[in-house]
């Protein structure tokens, strides 16, 4: 809300002095599929619907993090390694087709412990939230995958995909963590969560 108020203030000043205005803004936020940003987007639309009002935005602003991955139909799998300066990693997967999540937690850097969870298992779990607790290399991890419909495309299901631990200050740095989506019949996008 503070961003939008700042934009309005700047545009009001530009209107007052009779000048067009371009605001350059570095967002730094993750993707939203649950509707949290709908009202904010409506405010931005109303501010930029006036001729001479332009907002240029840079999303992400965290070049060191993996922000997006796409596995198209026909490709069996796609994946990446994940880490964070916190004790958890959080991504959002989105697809209209069923697929399999593979989360691998490595003992050190070479011995993976893979956990496979299907999207159907998540949807069938109580509250569409699937939990797995496991120990790898003496460290306790919790895998949580929760499902909900995309507010923008109701035929697509979004999955909050989280791995957390209290045993690592910076998850994925001593024991590597990889995310993989599998299933040749599914088109899956994965976004970094906030």
Give a label for each model feature.
Residues 1-194:
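Loop-rich non-cytosolic ectodomains and luminal regions
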């Amino acid at each position: 809300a503070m961003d939008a108020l700042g934009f309005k203030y700047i545009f009001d000043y530009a209107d007052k002095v009779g000048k067009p205005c371009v605001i350059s803004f570095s967002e730094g936020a993750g993707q939203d599929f649950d509707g949290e940003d709908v009202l904010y987007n409506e405010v931005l639309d109303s501010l930029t619907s006036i001729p001479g009002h332009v907002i240029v935005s840079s999303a992400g602003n965290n070049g060191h993090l993996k922000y997006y991955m796409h596995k198209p139909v026909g490709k069996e799998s796609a994946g990446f390694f994940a880490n964070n300066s916190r004790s958890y990693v959080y991504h959002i997967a989105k697809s209209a087709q069923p697929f399999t999540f593979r989360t691998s937690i490595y003992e050190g850097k070479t011995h993976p412990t893979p956990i496979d969870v299907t999207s159907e298992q998540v949807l069938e779990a109580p509250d569409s939230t699937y939990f797995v607790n496991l120990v790898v290399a003496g460290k306790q991890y919790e895998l949580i995958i929760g499902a909900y419909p995309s507010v923008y495309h109701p035929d697509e299901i979004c999955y909050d995909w989280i791995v957390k631990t209290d045993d690592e200050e910076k998850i994925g740095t001593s024991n590597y963590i990889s995310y993989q989506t599998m299933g040749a019949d599914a088109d899956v996008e994965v976004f970094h969560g906030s």
